[in-house]
Amino acid sequence: MVAYFAYGSNMDRMQMADRCPDSVVVGPATLPDHAFRIATGGYATVVPSPSDAVHGVLWHLPETDEASLDAYENLASDFYRKIECEVTDGDGVRRPAMLYVASDPTPGRPVPGYQEKVVAAAIEHGFPAPYVGQLSGWIPPR
């Protein structure tokens, strides 16, 4: 099993059940000294940012689900790359985890419907209201 830190649409339980059917949600976690961004491709990434933190969801993935997620996140195209990090779980315990970051973190606009899914998942997992507000700020005006 690998620990996976999701901070974008993979926080959504139904999406993960479809992509990684044997995944198990551990619970909310935070990635210190990073900030959430939408990259130029229209999807989430994180960037180093001292004193900030990214809220997300920690999952346990068996190797088969990790391979499926690698394919879904299109590592071969170099849009995302997989890195190792250390997150803090809901009990304050620091844990090693992997996550995907955009190879090009240049800021962009979310693809239609993407950020709304991220915000809904953040609310479902009980993230702090100020953080949900920050995520909502990435939703383009209609």
Locate each region found by the language model.
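Glycine-aromatic micro-motifs
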Residues: 1-142
